[in-house]
Amino acid sequence: MAFGTDPTPDGLANPPIDDLMKHADSKYALAIFAAKRARQINSYFTQLNEGLLQNVGPLVEYQNNEKPLSIAFREIDEGLLEETLGEDDANEGN
């Protein structure tokens, strides 16, 4: 068993922020995009335990201890999601 750091970082360092920024106009937009998807994933897991399936589950393979935000970032990085602005998002900041 080797000791030390894992060569492939998990969490916010993987995927790198520079790769994620290719899929959003700004860091703010990326944060909102990922947070919304993470809430959907979290709702999916909650509904899965209750036998309801109203949200789409993770689009990438995940591990049981992985956080919904990390899953959302990986989905964004792999190009599986497309950001679209709703009415509330389009009017924000005006």
Curated annotation (Swiss-Prot):
Keywords: DNA-directed RNA polymerase, Nucleotidyltransferase, Transcription, Transferase
Entry's EC annotation: 2.7.7.6
Catalytic activity: RNA(n) + a ribonucleoside 5'-triphosphate = RNA(n+1) + diphosphate
Biological process terms in GO annotation: DNA-templated transcription
SUPFAM superfamilies in UniProt: RPB6/omega subunit-like
Molecular function terms from GO: DNA binding; DNA-directed RNA polymerase activity
Cellular component GO terms held in the UniProt record: DNA-directed RNA polymerase complex
Main function: Promotes RNA polymerase assembly. Latches the N- and C-terminal regions of the beta' subunit thereby facilitating its interaction with the beta and alpha subunits.
UniProt-recorded name of the protein: DNA-directed RNA polymerase subunit omega
Species whose genome carries this gene: Bifidobacterium longum subsp. infantis (strain ATCC 15697 / DSM 20088 / JCM 1222 / NCTC 11817 / S12)
Gene: rpoZ
